[in-house]
Design a protein with these regions (language model features):
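OB-fold and OB-like single-stranded nucleic-acid-recognition modules
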Residues: 2-219
Length: 219
């Protein structure tokens, strides 16, 4: 169990306590529904729907994030396109085997969703284990950056594999870590468009990752 001084909070008024010895995957988003919800899948006898949520950064650019929620949640919130929403949930990953777009897709599984007039917000807190050696590199502008792949356990025993990046001194420190390192990070979920070279030309794709503002090695 982590010491009390490692217990953090995203927003107590939302009941979203960042108690790292109890919750290792929490997301808080405020943004705008960018398109009408579409049917996603059925699991455990429940229908799930998905929609894109646009969240504005301080820079003025936007992250477009995939939200997945139960049909009952969708009916209760009665949200329409362009609605302002608060989403509390968990970051999930799945492998895209359709052969189109990114291979690893991140979604936010909504545990709570409601209409809001709060400003845009994008925060995530994760505790997990490195499952791949860090990839340290330098950007064309000379900034140190390090790519990490974090395995975050669910209560069910399965794991989500979440790509993360960190910068500067944090990137240089993370570059020395090994597979099996346990760490905690806080940051935001971001979407990033890029071009993929294919046989018939360039294809625009979207990558999803966690940009870490704070990161700490736990074990």
């Amino acid at each position: 169990m982590l010491p009390q001084n490692r217990i953090k909070h995203l927003n107590e008024k939302d009941g979203m306590r960042m108690e790292l010895n109890q919750e290792n995957n929490q997301v808080r988003l405020c943004g705008t529904m960018a398109a009408a919800p579409q049917y996603s899948h059925n699991a455990g006898g429940q229908d799930f729907y998905s929609f894109p949520l646009e969240v504005e950064r301080l820079s003025g650019s936007f992250d477009t994030l995939n939200i997945v929620l139960r049909e009952s949640q969708l009916a209760a919130v009665e949200a329409e396109e362009k609605a302002r929403l608060l989403v509390l949930g968990e970051l999930r990953s799945f492998n895209n085997r359709r052969g189109e777009g990114a291979k690893l897709v991140l979604t936010v599984l909504a545990r709570e969703i409601r209409l809001t007039d709060e400003p845009d917000d994008n925060r995530v807190s994760l505790t997990g284990t490195l499952c791949k050696l860090p990839n340290a590199r330098v950007t064309p502008l000379g900034r140190d950056i390090c790519d990490l792949l974090l395995a975050v356990n669910r209560r069910s025993g399965r794991s989500d594999y979440l790509p993360c990046i960190c910068w500067g001194s944090r990137a240089r420190e993370a570059a020395e870590w090994t597979v099996g390192t346990v760490l905690h990070l806080e940051g935001r979920v971001q979407s990033r468009d890029y071009l993929k070279l294919r046989g018939d030309g360039l294809e625009r794709r979207t990558a999803y990752e966690v940009s870490a503002a704070e990161i700490e090695k736990l074990a």
